C-alpha cells in the first residue's frame, strides 16, 4: 500500500487523549502502522543512569496509530488522502476534501 502519511506532513489527531492537537510527523513506521508526531502523545519514561547519560524522568513522543491521525488540508481541516496519476505518469497525493495536491 502506498504511503498516505509521510515524514514532514502536518497532521491532526482524530481520537484519543490528544484529540484535536496538530503536529508534524517526524517518523513513520509502516510495518507497525504507526507514526511519531512532534508534541503529540507525550509519555514519561524513567531513565536509569548510565556512564554516558544521567537518569531521571524524560518526556518523549510515543507512536500513534495511523488510523487516528489525518492530514491537515490548506483550509486547516482534516482530510483523507487519495492518489492521482498525472499526464507525465507520476503519482501524486491529493486531498479528498479540496482536490488539491499535497506537497511532498
From Swiss-Prot:
Coiled coil: none
Pfam families: KOW, ribosomal_L24
One GO CC term, this protein: ribosome
GO MF term set: rRNA binding; structural constituent of ribosome
Keywords: Ribonucleoprotein, Ribosomal protein, RNA-binding, rRNA-binding
Keyword Repeat: no
PROSITE patterns per record: RIBOSOMAL_L24
Purpose of the protein: One of two assembly initiator proteins, it binds directly to the 5'-end of the 23S rRNA, where it nucleates assembly of the 50S subunit.
Complex formation: Part of the 50S ribosomal subunit.
Record-given protein name: Large ribosomal subunit protein uL24
Organism: Nitrobacter winogradskyi (strain ATCC 25391 / DSM 10237 / CIP 104748 / NCIMB 11846 / Nb-255)
Gene (name only): rplX
Amino acid at each position: 500500500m502506498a504511503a498516505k502519511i509521510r515524514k514532514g506532513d502536518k497532521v491532526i489527531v482524530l481520537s484519543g487523549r490528544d484529540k484535536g492537537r496538530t503536529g508534524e510527523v517526524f517518523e513513520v513506521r509502516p510495518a507497525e502502522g504507526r507514526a511519531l508526531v512532534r508534541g503529540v502523545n507525550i509519555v514519561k519514561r524513567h531513565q536509569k543512569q548510565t556512564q554516558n547519560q544521567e537518569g531521571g524522568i524524560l518526556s518523549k513522543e510515543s507512536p500513534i496509530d495511523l488510523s487516528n491521525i489525518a492530514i491537515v488540508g490548506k483550509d486547516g481541516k482534516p482530510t483523507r488522502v487519495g492518489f492521482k496519476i498525472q499526464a507525465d505518469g507520476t503519482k501524486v497525493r491529493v486531498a479528498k476534501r479540496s482536490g488539491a495536491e499535497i506537497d511532498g
